[in-house]
Amino acid sequence: MSGVELQPESTQSEEKEEPKTAATTISSTEETKTENPNVALDNLAKTPIQLILQPTPQTPAKTPETPRIQKINNLKKSASFDSKNQPEDSKTPKQRDQLIEVPSDEVGRVENNIDNLPFYHGFMGRTECESMLSNHGDFLIRMTEVGRRVAYVISVRWHYQNSHVLVKRTKTKKLYWTKKYAFKSICELIAYHKLNQIPFYDNMTLICGLARHEWQLNNEQVTLNKKLGEGQFGEVHKGKLKTSVFTPPVIVAVKTLHQNHLSANEKILFLKEANVMLTLAHPNVIKFYGVCTMKEPIMIVMEFCDGSSLEDVLLSKESKVSSEDKILYLFHAACGIDYLHGKHVIHRDIAARNCLLNSKKVLKISDFGLSVKGVAIKERKGGCLPVKYMAPETLKKGFYSTASDIYSYGALVYEVYTDGKTPFESCGLRGNELRKAIIGKSVILTIDVECPEFVKAIFEQSRLYDTEQRISSKRIIEIFKEEAGMHELDATGLFGRIGSFFSRVRRQKEAEPSVPILT
């Protein structure tokens, strides 16, 4: 999977591509003129399929009959219908213009459940798919939406170009076809063209089907239990993931997509989070198990953290977060952010609500719905944005970088040491007024509560307006190691070192602690 933005399928190829009456003999003359496989689908969408009335050698009949699909029982032995043995231009109009139904016994015994085909990948965006096509002849079958209808697409790599061919259906018999031959099922269409190496569109044949990855899960592997929350596109559940018949199921968190009233573009945006998480593996980043895209509901399966979010812990009235734990959580967050930046991932929504804790007090960065891959990007878009956490260069010009994540990390430090207060909560400004105030420096976030001096210095360096002067995640980690003795990510190993730091601070209570130089 690639991390670039995914584009929804074109909505040009809809019902107009299907025959308009019970007749299923169609014109493919224009189709054979397509020379560039990269625009095959687009050209087909622009060419209306016409009904072809078979000419009679005698005097024209008063009321010509509309021909039906031609059905032949010995297609493999018939050279006149074998596109491998006869060039397209040498065929007579009658041969070229007919859509031929291939009976099931001519195809042979095939798998009739498309979910069981190893190269069927379920719902997938075009760009995401193209990242998997690398060699000539590679192909996969995926599901998309054309308008509001679900359709199958054959995506193939052919002579260093990617093509996406929509599988169409006839009006009355609902047969599947792409070029010349029609079948009762999509599985028969694929099996026949692959076995006989007959071009399924232009001169393209199906050579090497790309199998699904381990992270492409079947819906049957996931069991949904307690609902944990609800988001923009769906719900979050606690559930179980069955990875093997020999091992017990894993407790997971599952994001499910609402099944109704969502466009293809919204579904692609939902899966964008999984696209970013694919290559991530770090103790301070939420673990990604996989996605279920074979059928509804579409799901993202992730690690379940049984310790709630950092925001909930900070706001809890039952117990106050200790000074030791505050240091611990901020160190873990810095480690997670540094790992993301090393993978060229900009999170774009660092906040206490997106930091999860497990039972061992290990913090994990989560929620990659706004994340992008890259070192720096410029994006101007509306919608609901976390203005109170965003950097001034983002609010002013839509510019995102690793430095803008560090600015948000400063807001996280503020949340931790104010026991969960929202940044700029007391200034009384909201929305565009707050955005202008942050850009114009008329409001500045400060920590006025008791806080270790080195943490306060990190906070101040992270909130600098000049992105070049802002502290880096690597330097933040170094300071935590130097000042608090942190060298391991294991929570148990950290407690002793944190304790020794605070013991030293208490012994030097009356002395003014030195402020580290942050470079």
UniProtKB/Swiss-Prot annotation:
Record-linked PROSITE patterns: PROTEIN_KINASE_DOM, PROTEIN_KINASE_TYR, SH2
Recorded catalytic activity of this chain's protein: L-tyrosyl-[protein] + ATP = O-phospho-L-tyrosyl-[protein] + ADP + H(+)
One family name in Pfam for this protein: PK_Tyr_Ser-Thr
TM ranges: none
Polar residues biased stretches: 73-84
Matching InterPro entries: Fes/Fps/Fer_SH2, Kinase-like_dom_sf, Non-receptor_tyrosine_kinases, Prot_kinase_dom, Ser-Thr/Tyr_kinase_cat_dom, SH2, SH2_dom_sf, Tyr_kinase_AS
Residue ranges constituting the SH2 domain according to the UniProt record: 119-208
GO molecular function terms listed in the Swiss-Prot or TrEMBL record: ATP binding; non-membrane spanning protein tyrosine kinase activity; signaling receptor binding
A single cellular component GO annotation: plasma membrane
Compositional bias segments (type: Basic and acidic residues): 85-97
Example GO biological process: cell differentiation
Keywords (A to Z) from UniProt: ATP-binding, Cell membrane, Cytoplasm, Differentiation, Kinase, Membrane, Nucleotide-binding, SH2 domain, Spermatogenesis, Transferase, Tyrosine-protein kinase
Binding site for ATP: V146, G147, R148, R149, V150, A151, Y152, V153, I154, K184
Keyword Nucleotide-binding among UniProt keywords: yes
Function: Probable non-receptor tyrosine-protein kinase which plays a role in spermatid activation (spermiogenesis) in hermaphrodites.
Protein's recorded name: Spermatocyte protein spe-8
